[in-house]
Amino acid sequence: MSDLTRLTISQARAKLRGKEITATEITEAYLSAIDRANPALNAYVAVTGDRARDMAKASDARLVKGEGGALEGIPLGIKDLFGTEGVHTQACSHVLDGFKPLYESTVTANLWADGAVMLGKLNMDEFAMGSSNETSYYGPVINPWRRSRLDTVVMPTTHQGDGGFVSAGGTKTQRSLDNAQLVPGGSSGGSATAVSAFLCAGATATDTGGSIRQPAAFTGTVGIKPTYGRCSRWGIVAFASSLDQAGPIARDVRDAAILLKSMASVDPKDTTSVDRPVPDYEAAIGKPIKGMKVGIPKEYRVDGMPEEIEALWQKGIAWLRDAGAEIVDISLPHTKYALPAYYIVAPAEASSNLARYDGVRYGLRVPGKDIVEMYEKTRAAGFGREVKRRIMIGTYVLSAGYYDAYYLQAQKVRNLIKRDFENVFAAGVDVILTPATPSAAFGIADEDMAADPVKMYLNDIFTVTVNMAGLPGIAVPAGLDPKGLPLGLQLIGRPFEEETLFQTAAVIEQAAGTFQPEKWW
């Protein structure tokens, strides 16, 4: 039997329903792959093998009877931000040591109701704060992609018997992999690595400023951040409540559409979830885009953008034009203010949300001589450096002397960013095409990034506007850089028009193809 982990969700779904394979077989294949690869990649922080086998067995029983949901028997990885009843849920933070919730997040409950199988919990940046998956208490996730290089190899002169001439030697070039470890992006780095390295069929993720789309672009996978309110946030550990949104990371556009259909729902437990029908996103794939108006924002041509990113963008424009779309130049004038405004709003909300972690009822507790010292010691030991930095920023901008100067101004900028998009869509633009990231994946422990947090924050330059405006955005693989690393393009849509994103992303995918890392782990 061929490697079952190589099947896409749509392929596995067909084989499961056709009784060509069983849920138990494909689940065991993934558990074996995780066992072999996770020591090298660190994608999973908890593997739920026994639960996965029980869920697969139950799926097989339903499939035998011709029953089963939309994801029956499909093995998935779950980002450690999603509450999973009785299972490790720590947001990859020391402060939540040993926490196993008594509840199930709405998104994961939807997946289990549709028959999905849980393989385990995936690594991530601590409390989803990061763009490289290096802030996790459990250590960095390793990108399964590596840079490749051309080596010149000297060929020996060889002879055969009695001086018979075979080869005159000389040189030849061959491509080989660099050993340098790369980041998978963040905060959903474990999700992206697990999908890219065939350690799950698909994964849940969350996106507050680009945490689905940037890792997807860095790993050659597809990631969609749906419209704010499309998926329930109930049971998901909060970072910035007005920006957080759950979505899937998958191997191709169709798989992402299948997953989002199951993840999305209205939820009375989340007042920000929106009560509107969830469409059949998969049905949008393959529809022509002839006559669709695609906007190209001039403000996304940033200083110092690498040539390969601009070239990729132009290639994407050509693909959509060739498919019959009308390309129009647009302006989103407040784009340049999005990143500084985001890094005021998000930390402000985080400082409020993270105030609840005090060591009293659950998680880490470091004793002190009184309750105040216990709070101080617990939070000092429990939170990592980046989380502390953002709590301090948030507390500062919310303080009495600076609230008007920073937080209030940032919220005004947010409204202007939202209005920019509204004006463009009102003018008839159907979808906006931009790069997903300003570069390909960079190295683990990059000295420039470590020395200047702002450089790390700039990884979100193309993605934060989408969160600030509450819009849907999808990252789709579109090519490789000169060193063989994946690059992605981003599509931004009107509110609740994820179908248009899937429809357009499928055109890019068909033109660009799909990308898989060369296995080294």
From Swiss-Prot:
Q: Could you tell me what reaction this enzyme catalyses?
A: L-glutamyl-tRNA(Gln) + L-glutamine + ATP + H2O = L-glutaminyl-tRNA(Gln) + L-glutamate + ADP + phosphate + H(+)
Tell me a GO biological process for this protein. translation
Q: Name one GO cellular component term.
A: glutamyl-tRNA(Gln) amidotransferase complex
EC class of the enzyme, as a word: ligase
Q: Which domain of life is it from?
A: Bacteria
GO terms (molecular function) for this protein are: ATP binding; glutaminyl-tRNA synthase (glutamine-hydrolyzing) activity
Q: What is its EC number?
A: 6.3.5.7
Please tell me whether the keyword RNA-binding is annotated for this protein: no
Q: Where is the active site?
A: K79, S187, S211
| Coiled-coil region list | none
- Return the protein name: Glutamyl-tRNA(Gln) amidotransferase subunit A
